[in-house]
Amino acid sequence: MASARLALARAYARSGVLAGVAAVVLVLAGVGTAIIDQTAGAAVTGLRDRVAAAAGADGAVRWEIRRSTDPEAQAEAGAAVLDRTLPAETIEWERSAESAPVPIAAATDAADGIDTAAGSEPDGTDDSPETRLVLLADPAIAERARLVEGVWPDAASADEASAVVPTAVHQGAADALGLAIGDTIELVDRRLQIVGTWLPDDARAPSWFGEPLVATGSADGAAGPFLVDEPALDGLPVAVRVRWTATPIIDALTPDTARELTGDFARTAPALAAQPGIGEDGLSRLGGLPATIDAATAGLDAVRAITPLPLLLLAAAGIAALGRLGTLLAGARRGETVLLRARGAATRQLVGWQAGEAAAVGAPAAVLGAAAGELGLLLLRPGEPRSLAIAAAVAAASVLVAVVLLAASAWGEARRPVTRSTGDDSGRGTRAAALGGTILVAVAAAVSLWQFRLYGSPLVRTADGGTAVDPLAVLAPVLVLLALALGALACTPFVSRLLERVASARPGLVPSLPLRQLARRAPMFAAASFTAMLGVAGIVLTAAVAGSWQRFDADAAALATGGEVRVVGAADPAAAAEAAAALPEVVVEPVVRREIRVGPETATLVATGLDLLPQVAPGLPDDVQDAIGAIEAADASLLPVAIDERLSAGTSAGPGDRISLRLGSADGTIDARVAAVVQAVPGAGEFGVLADRAELDAAVTEAGARTPSADELWIGAADPNAVVAAFDRERPGGAVALARDASSTASLVAPAITALWLGAIGALAAALAALIALAAALGSSRRGEVLVLRALGAPAAMQGRARFAELAAAVGTAIVLGAAIGAVAAWATAAELARAAVPGAPAALAPAIVLDWWPLLAALGAFALATAAVALVAARAVTVAAGRPGREEVR
């Protein structure tokens, strides 16, 4: 019982430092839980959002083969393979059959539904193209389409079915052909009767595979689809193909199951080809779902270059703060430890007391922190999966770290001899150990940074072609921060002594006394100084990584998409251009984009109106803007162009050089002159050529070649997403609109950047907790000094100012040094981290180091205000104590 009372008394006497321990544990548990759980949940949500955003063929995979003479056996064979190779938990598939366009019999009467005389000449000849129909058998169509009028074919009466083939026609085809319910259509060997009209619920849905015919009802001279029961496809005079279309179950996708799916897709085609009864006529795999999943998982792999950084930063700051607080606590108890040891206290007893203190204050703080972290995620990021196991593990780890570090500091102090030599009291052994540790960390940082710069990122390629996080390179940013902070900390005593000598020559107690205290009590101030340096350095590094990634991602997305909105795949480009021009607040520019040959290289030519390019494609990199000016100012005797760096290297062509552009065997060759070299040409990918479209037309005409037509549209818009939505609804000319957001990595990387900010802010919070503990320890250990100074005539207010000056000088110096350390670490690693986070960026595009200023200034400003408040409270306590009457032994 006496032992327990003594332990409680010891804890109460150092309650300020133990409160700091509890605060650090709370920060570690809360911020650590938020980082890990948010990163895990965001990875799943980001993957699902990315795959769900894929439209048409990009969100599905399809296997096609000619319909066999035994379709039932073929269907069973296909189902057996797909059920075996595709996991039902994450993928679903449907079978359908579609005919090639079927010609309508020439004798069809207009009263039967189709007016064949609309294009007839007076002499009876017909100058209109022949109308063809596409027949579709799809048992699951009712799940993704709606009836406009009538019934589905399988609901038609038996009498109707015996005479004609009942069909439901796409409403767009019905409008174009003038069809209504009850009309009949004569084919070569059968008659169709319209029993219903339908429209897709969402023509962009992956299950429709992006077919223009489904979107509009007509494409490439064919109308439809005309939905029929599958037996109606027997004996058609055209080819009929069977399709198995697979789409992912979005809510079941995880990063691991998504990676497994790509392997499942690769195995399915060979398994189908080898399956008896499937047929042998042209099995093919179509669709972009594997590429979509690969792009999404590549983005998640890229995020792995950043996700360890906030945890490492938080852990380093937390461990440093707890270690320094343990040292501070052991140093403050040095006298009582010597006394207890002299009276027979065992080392394990002293260690057990301090470990128990750490557990007693740390466990409630860890539970509270983990709960706060989970609650914050539920409020700020609802709908994401959460894991209580993560919260429990982080809370337990935080308490364990606190217990181990405080127990280690107590063990180190208790193991010191009771009777100590001058060398023991001087701390030379401790300083030597600290110097050795600093050297070891510096060596580790140098090796890690070398590995990091060698690979260009923390990610490395594995033998199977995937990516993995290099365990040494990923430590580089934090090890650089630690090494520089430890080096700065090792130098601060010498700087403090120098400043003390300078200040001692000046009259007055301030600033001589504060600087002398900093020099003489350097180990005690090290707890707050080191964690403050690390926290400030971490926030500067975070701002550099965040700003550099944002700029690099924006540049890469602009180069990938070109315009703010890019319209591609139009079967009728004129209709797409007309629809785009009718939208409000848009600038539309047609773009020629085609493959050409430049010397030995295959390149992509992008030709558009350069005078409008800044309007349709704002935010392009500066070198592209400069290239536009160079092209416009160049001599027009030869076609002026800009080429990218890779093409320049491959052809040994630079500004002013003459090159030949081979447009194709039918379009001839034109001569051009290089006006500028850019890192990458917008919309071209690698090996790009940029030219003005009007000048290209003039050069082609002069060469006697065929003028190239525009392949796509670039649109500048006040609201790009509204333009994309309009194209999704109308699908003019079968076109697909893509915004820059589709090429951005923000949906996957932004949560990791948020986690990085959380880690840096957590490091600052740990530093603030260490400062509060330092202020409390100084207040309890230097009461006698306050009385002595008062007896010597030092006013209470001056003593308060001296204490404020001590803390302000220590923390202010740490902030300045931390900012410098963060700048050095950012210079060494931020650009590589930004590149690693944008895996699809052109290799020639160099990331620039840019600071995200507003969060940086807000975080540093809040930290400076908080530290100033702590210093003011500590100074106020000294002022009150120095001005209180009475003797110390009475108080």
What do the PLM-derived regions correspond to, one by one?
Residues G16, R348, G352-A365, G369, ...:
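Alpha-helical transmembrane segments of multi-pass membrane proteins
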Residues L313, E357-R381, G762-I772, A809-A830, ...:
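Hydrophobic alpha-helical transmembrane segments that constitute the membrane-spanning cores
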